[in-house]
Amino acid sequence: MAFIKALAEYEKMRADVTATPESLEYWLFDKQAAEVLFAITDGKEVGFALYFNNFSTFLGKAGLYLEDIYVLPQYRGRGIGKALFAELARIAVERGYGRFEWACLDWNEPSIGFYRSLGAVGLPEWTTYRLTGGALMKLAGASNDICE
């Protein structure tokens, strides 16, 4: 939880964190909805990356989607973030995935520069949409027998 809270602080989204240790245990271990890598230096967890599968109908292949990555500020600039990305890329290649994707806040210039240094390209023609809470429930209530 400490990494999640620290990431939320950095992203100016602390109030949005509703995860609990119990909800993380349920979704990550019981449901296996995502996987987590930890960066460990001198026996201490100093960063993490949470990822899961997505799928491209155009490629006809699964992909790797990075939901969150965070390295403690005092450990940045030491290659830890790059090592996490390299390991995620290795996993994607090993599993035969067609791509490795993630989103980044548009104001996060340090991260954008870092991602570009890795060879990643932004997708300015795409806009992310999200349904949560009441909007998600309302739309779910509109479901009918057309979809199977």
PLM region spans:
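A short helix-loop-beta-strand connector motif used in the catalytic cores of GNAT acetyltransferases and
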Residues: 26-38, 65
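Conserved acetyl-CoA-binding loop of GNAT-fold acetyltransferases
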Residues: 89, 97, 116-125
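Conserved beta-strand-loop-alpha-helix junction that forms the acyl-donor binding cleft
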Residues: 101-111, 123, 130-134
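Conserved GNAT-fold acetyl-CoA-binding loop/helix
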Residues: 4-26
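Conserved acetyl-CoA-binding loop-helix of GNAT-fold acetyltransferases
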Residues: 71, 77-90, 113, 117
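Conserved beta-hairpin
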Residues: 34-49, 72
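Conserved GNAT acetyl-CoA-binding A-motif
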Residues: 92-104
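A conserved beta-turn-beta hairpin within the catalytic core of GNAT-like acetyltransferases
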Residues: 44, 54-66, 76, 123-124
